[in-house]
Amino acid sequence: MGLKLNGRYISLILAVQIAYLVQAVRAAGKCDAVFKGFSDCLLKLGDSMANYPQGLDDKTNIKTVCTYWEDFHSCTVTALTDCQEGAKDMWDKLRKESKNLNIQGSLFELCGGGNGAAGPLLPALPVLLVSLSAALATWLSF
């Protein structure tokens, strides 16, 4: 049975993890270009969510949001690849730890489930969109 949290807590957890990653990269000192790449990834995700098509069926909604989510992670890993101080490894570690939080309705649960059983999470889709938007707003205020 997973931990049940509302959208505010989910966005707070994501914001803390992103802040932790930024601090780790900033401490490395040799990865200055990574901030531009990571920022571009966040902006791309934000643009995708802001231009989210309305009126799609549930299956298409999930597929669309999960595509945005996976694109964000791929973009982030690409942006961190050039950093020699282990930022990519840190990001992968944070991603794995986030999956282990087992927060019901999280994008990791919605998009990463290998069993394809995303049906019960469909009502949580608007909350996920709002919480992700809140996390992006929190990030941009840093």
From Swiss-Prot:
Source organism phylogeny: Eukaryota, Metazoa, Chordata, Craniata, Vertebrata
Name under which the protein is recorded: Neuritin
This protein's UniProt keywords: Cell membrane, Glycoprotein, GPI-anchor, Lipoprotein, Membrane, Signal, Synapse
Annotated localization: Cell membrane; Synapse
GO BP annotation list: neuron projection extension; presynaptic modulation of chemical synaptic transmission; regulation of synapse maturation
Family: Belongs to the neuritin family.
Chain positions listed as propeptide in the UniProt record: 117-142
GO molecular function: identical protein binding
Subunit structure of this chain's protein: Component of the outer core of AMPAR complex. AMPAR complex consists of an inner core made of 4 pore-forming GluA/GRIA proteins (GRIA1, GRIA2, GRIA3 and GRIA4) and 4 major auxiliary subunits arranged in a twofold symmetry. One of the two pairs of distinct binding sites is occupied either by CNIH2, CNIH3 or CACNG2, CACNG3. The other harbors CACNG2, CACNG3, CACNG4, CACNG8 or GSG1L. This inner core of AMPAR complex is complemented by outer core constituents binding directly to the GluA/GRIA proteins at sites distinct from the interaction sites of the inner core constituents.
Pfam family, one: NRN1
Membrane topology: Lipid-anchor; GPI-anchor
GO terms for cellular component: AMPA glutamate receptor complex; extracellular space; glutamatergic synapse; plasma membrane; presynapse; side of membrane
Lipid attachment in record (GPI-anchor amidated glycine): G116
Annotated signal peptide: 1-27
Function summary: Promotes neurite outgrowth and especially branching of neuritic processes in primary hippocampal and cortical cells.
InterPro entries noted in UniProt: Neuritin_fam
